[in-house]
């Protein structure tokens, strides 16, 4: 694991980054109404929980609503019990999870590539339009992305420690707890996705011995203690819960077109290409990390882990018969770390530097075009026929501004200087 020469930022730099992050994720959260259908739905369900005093059975307009587990509803109910505008309160936890995901990218990048990669990964993720924009929306998927990211980051940090080293056991338990919270957020994928990613990593990195270090009994007990009680209570109070929740909402939604959310197999590739602008232009350069490391790839397990994470998420959701844009959010953090590694590699490898320059220039151009188009829509110069779009712009534009700022910082060398602090 790379050891940094210095792992501190100046107080001025920390303050500037903190202010920028707060503005990006929390600025103007209440300046636009809740968007239908999702934001309104995920505000009404917790409101009804508070009104009825029933936190086991979710209801929407009085009708049972078991499409999702209740953790995000509970969090929103807690937020709505505070004084303030409902628009702000309902988006508060999503913004916190989005910012928390940036922190996880920093931890993961720092562990794999050092402090410069960690800081760059955090900047890449935080300034990616899709991540920043959906952090400002009242949707469940950002919470899921955070908990899945926390589970996988805890796994990585735990396996990087020596057996018995201080903090190792806490990280293993953190992995189980985060997977349980992900399960309470959006169902079985909360543990299936981390389990699949970890299995693939152990397979390709040939690190099966890690399994002997996992506290399976205590970890499983912790997972069950967090994830199971609500499922038991919901089944006891609602006879049709088990079939609807496990069969209809998990199996049938994934394997059939019943939800009427079909899209082409390449749908999420396109979403990532646009949603990570300008950094999606840098990702092809990340492929050179694997080509250059062919002979020593087993000595760079971080690359294997990031590839297993990103590719499995992409393939898993691409195979689903139900596709929506936010589903791919959990696959963005490893791509941010890969982009940061590519940017670092570009400083020493001329060919990687050429790839980064060309891809970055294309990404910056596309970002500028996208920002200009959205601005014209907001000003009424372009008519889309989609009435909510001007409201979407309110939280999309800060993300685009962050992306443009990051491009300017990188192009001028200021981002590299910042990451070196």
Model-predicted regions and their roles:
Residues 4, 154-166, 170, 190-224, ...:
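Perimembrane helix-loop-helix junctions
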Residues 136-144:
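Short acidic/glycine- and proline-prone juxtamembrane loop motifs at membrane-interface regions
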Residues 13-19, 105-127:
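Transmembrane-helix signature of polytopic, membrane-embedded enzymes
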Residues 70, 74, 82-100, 138:
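Loop-to-helix entry region of an early transmembrane alpha helix in multi-pass inner-membrane enzymes
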Residues 1-24, 221:
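Start-transfer (signal-anchor) and selected internal transmembrane alpha helices
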Residues 2-5, 169, 173, 289-421:
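Membrane-embedded architecture of ER/inner-membrane glycosylation machinery
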Residues 92-112, 150:
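Transmembrane-helix motifs of polytopic, lipid-linked glycan transferases
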Residues 23-28, 41-67, 71-74, 78:
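Extracytosolic helix-loop segments that constitute the early lumenal/periplasmic catalytic or substrate-binding loops
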């Amino acid at each position: 694991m790379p050891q940094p020469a210095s792992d501190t930022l100046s107080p001025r730099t920390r303050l500037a980054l903190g202010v920028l992050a707060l503005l990006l994720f929390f600025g103007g959260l209440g300046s636009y109404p809740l968007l239908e259908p999702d934001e309104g739905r995920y505000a009404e369900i917790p409101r009804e929980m508070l009104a009825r005093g029933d936190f086991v059975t979710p209801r929407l307009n009085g009708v049972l609503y078991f499409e999702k587990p209740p953790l995000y509803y509970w969090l929103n109910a807690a937020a709505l019990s505070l004084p303030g505008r409902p628009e702000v309160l309902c988006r508060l936890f999503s913004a916190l999870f989005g910012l928390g995901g940036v922190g996880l990218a920093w931890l993961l990048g720092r562990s794999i590539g050092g402090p410069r990669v960690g800081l760059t990964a955090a900047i890449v993720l935080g300034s990616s339009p899709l991540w920043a924009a959906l952090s400002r929306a009242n949707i469940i998927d950002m919470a899921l992305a955070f908990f899945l990211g926390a589970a996988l980051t805890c796994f990585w940090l735990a396996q990087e420690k020596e057996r018995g080293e201080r903090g190792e056991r806490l990280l293993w338990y953190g992995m189980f707890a985060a997977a349980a919270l992900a399960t309470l957020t959006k169902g079985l994928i909360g543990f299936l996705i981390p389990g699949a990613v970890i299995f693939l990593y152990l397979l390709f990195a040939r690190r099966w011995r890690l399994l002997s270090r996992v506290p399976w009994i205590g970890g499983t007990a912790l997972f069950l203690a967090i994830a199971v009680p609500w499922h038991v209570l919901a089944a006891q109070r609602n006879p049709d819960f088990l079939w609807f929740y496990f069969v209809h909402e998990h199996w049938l939604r994934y394997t059939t077109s019943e939800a009427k959310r079909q899209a082409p197999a390449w749908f999420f590739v396109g979403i990532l290409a646009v949603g990570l602008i300008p950094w999606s232009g840098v990702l092809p350069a990340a492929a050179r990390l694997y080509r250059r490391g062919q002979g020593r790839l087993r000595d760079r397990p971080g690359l294997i882990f990031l590839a297993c994470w990103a590719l499995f998420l992409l393939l898993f959701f691409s195979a689903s018969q139900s596709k929506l844009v936010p589903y791919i959010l959990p696959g963005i953090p490893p791509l941010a770390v890969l982009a940061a590694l590519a940017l670092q590699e570009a400083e020493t490898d001329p060919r990687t530097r050429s790839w980064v320059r060309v891809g970055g220039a294309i990404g910056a151009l596309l970002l500028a075009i996208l920002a200009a188009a959205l601005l014209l829509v907001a000003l009424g110069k372009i008519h889309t026929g989609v009435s909510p779009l001007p409201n979407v712009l309110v939280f999309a534009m800060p993300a685009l501004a962050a992306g443009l700022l990051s491009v300017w910082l990188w192009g001028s060398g200021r981002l590299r200087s910042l990451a070196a602090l």
